[in-house]
Amino acid sequence: MAFSDFAAICSKTPLPLCSVIKSKTHLILSNSTIIHDFDPLNLNVGVLPRCYARSIDLANTVIFDVGNAFINIGALGVILIILYNIRQKYTAIGRSEYLYFFQLTLLLIIFTLVVDCGVSPPGSGSYPYFVAIQIGLAGACCWALLIIGFLGFNLWEDGTTKSMLLVRGTSMLGFIANFLASILTFKAWITDHKVATMNASGMIVVVYIINAIFLFVFVICQLLVSLLVVRNLWVTGAIFLGLFFFVAGQVLVYAFSTQICEGFKHYLDGLFFGSICNVFTLMMVYKTWDMTTDDDLEFGVSVSKDGDVVYDNGFM
């Protein structure tokens, strides 16, 4: 696979962006023949994977990737529970920042459902924009984690206007960078059905390499906090467990999706298990923060019967 070509990835994995990707390398499903000099000028469909989860027809509506849809619907419930638990820790360090991050992930999952389930079907005029928004939100989450990773070092006061502007501003830059890298690449391929360029190196650098670097920095920061600041090996274990789930999810999606799909007779593919791993990764991100932040025992917060927050400054 060339660095700027998605053909090798998309032939194995049914990623949403593959429906708007064009390449000279295509797989002919009827006889499993790979063509390297394919002319995609008048082709509206992107690179087809060797195997993908089958769709179902429900009430005259075609729903794609049903298994992955159920996982993402369940993920919405998990994120809502996490948001509720974060809101209950009134005095925890990084409460506002993590609340914002998980709100971003909630929005990302919603757009993932829109893209994966065919609410905006592949081939429609809106589909490339929804895919670009999904990629942009994923990038925003990665860029937000970059800033959140430094909270444990007390470089600035958490929860302040400055801190929230830093997190929100960085995530907004991440969204813009990933969205533009995606949609400009897509539009170069779909405008007037002409291929101005099939070079996607800019998109690969922004969406994959830069985001991966930011996630790596976040993990290193969390490890330093767990080992040097809070000195809690349970936190370190949660970090490694989350890292394991994340890496396992990427491997299942990008390396073994075809084998999974064929093994499950087209009912499931790598995206199903990748989504499960992503949910567990987010749970470990929350658990890591939960174990490293305790409410101030000298500053109690309770909720009255009328629903008002009551602050009690004193020993509990």
UniProtKB/Swiss-Prot annotation:
Family: Belongs to the CHS7 family.
GO BP: cell wall organization; chitin biosynthetic process; endoplasmic reticulum to Golgi vesicle-mediated transport; protein folding; protein transport
Name of this chain's protein: Chitin synthase export chaperone
Transmembrane spans: 62-82, 99-119, 130-150, 170-190, 200-220, 233-253, 266-286
Gene Ontology MF term list: unfolded protein binding
Keywords: Cell wall biogenesis/degradation, Endoplasmic reticulum, Membrane, Protein transport, Transmembrane, Transmembrane helix, Transport
Knockout consequences: Abolishes CHS3 localization to the bud neck with increased protein localization to the ER membrane.
Functional description taken from the UniProt entry: Chaperone required for the export of the chitin synthase CHS3 from the endoplasmic reticulum.
A single GO cellular-component term on record: cellular bud neck
Keyword Transmembrane attributed: yes
Subunit structure: Interacts with CHS3.
Bilayer topology term: Multi-pass membrane protein
Keyword hit for Transmembrane: yes
Principal location: endoplasmic reticulum
Organism name: Saccharomyces cerevisiae (strain ATCC 204508 / S288c)
InterPro entries referenced in this protein's UniProt entry, alphabetically: Chs7
Subcellular location(s) per record: Endoplasmic reticulum membrane
